[in-house]
Amino acid sequence: MHLRFTLMAAAAAILACGAPAQVIQFESNGLKYQTLSKTGLTVMFAHLPMQLRDYSAVQVGVSNGSNAACTVKPEDFSFRREDGTMNYALAAKDVVTQLLGRASRNDVSKLISTYEMSLSGIPRLHSTNGYEQRRQQALAEMSGTKLRAAAAASAIAFVSTKLEPGESTDGAVFFLTYGKPLGNGQLVVRTCGRIFEFESLPSSSGKTLEQR
């Protein structure tokens, strides 16, 4: 079953009850997910249990159940700390050049395995236009073990994506945290004319991947 069915099922449950939009929480494979739907668009996220030296990441899934196309991009995501200051997500190109470009091969392998493990924890988390599709395309265009590994890691980064009605996508959104967890606060998503807000209490057990 596709990601859009997973996310839209939550939206359908809310509509069936006639209740206003509310955050639904669930746990899978050790990750704590939150999902929220607004006028057909559904956003889901979970903190990934790893840090790549100076960066923290969240796994994101977005499904468009509305009647209109919309474009979602990593710059739509921000984190509001308890003191009110904002931490804005990195653009996909910055993730590749600043983060993945300096990571060791071992770090890249760990990043890939961490993200793929998070996907395997939710059998229904299968995007129509997400990580797996980007990975396959990148692997087809690259040759050499090191280049193919880097391409796969780059495919993890959430990229600007136009979602037609019924389409979905996923990826990792990265925040510069200087080696510290995101901490307590709110994940804020401003996209497609909607604002999604999630109370965020990440686990403190995240593993740090070294950059060289």
Range-by-range predicted roles:
Residues 1-9:
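Bacterial N-terminal signal peptides that target proteins for export
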Residues 7, 13, 208-210:
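Compositionally biased, intrinsically disordered low-complexity regions
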Residues 11-20:
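Hydrophobic h-region of N-terminal signal peptides that target proteins for export
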